[in-house]
């Protein structure tokens, strides 16, 4: 190292130039517009295509939509869906068991796309938790309850997204 360079380094470190450069950068961003969202109090808008908690839908007459074709179970890459079906007296087939293990689910939306009758949908609900592993194992009754509770929102999101499908 040359003498000039070492003197320059000594003066630079003695005058704390790196510290002042850092302080200038901090000052520059301190007064700029904040982009951080304080989550529980503030929420950002969600897209109509947001994929959150699953729900099973019903027809207007109260009958569940799922026809037990098992396409959603077949297309699920995480193998998170389990379906068992039974044949009714009128010859139609309906599910006797429809379970989704949310600890396995990757929320890809393939189940929703594969469903020919729009029975399984992903809602805008993302604030749910489980204290035990079994709490994130949703049964048919739980999924139908979610669908019944949020049917108006689900229908509005489906209508908003219809022109893009």
From Swiss-Prot:
Superkingdom of the organism of origin: Bacteria
BP-aspect Gene Ontology terms: aerobic respiration
Source species: Polaromonas sp. (strain JS666 / ATCC BAA-500)
Role according to the record: NDH-1 shuttles electrons from NADH, via FMN and iron-sulfur (Fe-S) centers, to quinones in the respiratory chain. The immediate electron acceptor for the enzyme in this species is believed to be ubiquinone. Couples the redox reaction to proton translocation (for every two electrons transferred, four hydrogen ions are translocated across the cytoplasmic membrane), and thus conserves the redox energy in a proton gradient.
Binding sites annotated in the UniProt record for [4Fe-4S] cluster 2: 76, 105, 108, 111
Annotated compartments: Cell inner membrane
Name under which the protein is recorded: NADH-quinone oxidoreductase subunit I
The protein's assembly and partners: NDH-1 is composed of 14 different subunits. Subunits NuoA, H, J, K, L, M, N constitute the membrane sector of the complex.
Cofactor: [4Fe-4S] cluster
Record-linked Gene3D superfamilies: 3.30.70.3270
Keyword NAD: yes
Residue positions binding [4Fe-4S] cluster 1: 66, 69, 72, 115
Membrane topology note: Peripheral membrane protein
Keywords: 4Fe-4S, Cell inner membrane, Cell membrane, Iron, Iron-sulfur, Membrane, Metal-binding, NAD, Quinone, Repeat, Translocase, Ubiquinone
GO molecular function: 4 iron, 4 sulfur cluster binding; iron ion binding; NADH:ubiquinone reductase (non-electrogenic) activity; quinone binding
Signal peptide (residue range): none
Family as reported in the entry's similarity comment: Belongs to the complex I 23 kDa subunit family.
Any single GO CC term annotated in Swiss-Prot or TrEMBL for this entry: plasma membrane
EC number: 7.1.1.-
Keyword Ligase: no
């Amino acid at each position: 190292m040359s003498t000039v360079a070492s003197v320059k380094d000594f003066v630079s470190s003695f005058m704390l130039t790196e510290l002042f450069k850092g302080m200038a950068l901090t000052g520059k961003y301190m007064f700029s517009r904040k982009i951080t969202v304080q989550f529980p109090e503030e929420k950002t808008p969600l897209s109509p295509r947001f994929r959150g908690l699953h729900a099973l839908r019903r027809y207007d007459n109260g009958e569940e939509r799922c026809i037990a074709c098992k396409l959603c179970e077949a297309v699920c890459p995480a193998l998170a869906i389990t379906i068992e079906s039974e044949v009714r007296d009128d010859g139609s087939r309906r599910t006797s068991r429809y379970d989704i293990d949310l600890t396995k689910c990757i929320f890809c939306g393939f189940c929703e796309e594969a469903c020919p009758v729009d029975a399984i949908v992903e809602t805008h609900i993302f604030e749910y938790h489980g204290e035990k592993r079994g709490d994130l194992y949703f049964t048919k009754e739980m999924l139908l309850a979610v669908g019944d509770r949020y049917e108006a929102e689900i229908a509005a999101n489906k209508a908003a997204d219809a022109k893009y499908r």
